Amino acid sequence: GSSGDDVRIAQSYLNKALGAGLTVDGRFGASTRQATEAFQAREGLSIDGVIGRTTWERLVLAFNAAL
């Protein structure tokens, strides 16, 4: 999987938007993928476990709404 700051941000956003309870470690492992899939399902997106452009845009909106 991917790793780094982008993944850390995504993990933080998934935690806030979904209550995912992920460890923010910057590693896109199985738990992060599962949380991504759950978020995609909730948002009615294609479920692929990958944070592409559309998923990212929805995640940012959901994060901001949860603030």
Locate each region found by the language model.
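C-terminal extensions
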Residues: 65-67
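Short acidic, glycine/serine/threonine-rich helix-capping segments at coil-helix boundaries
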Residues: 1-61
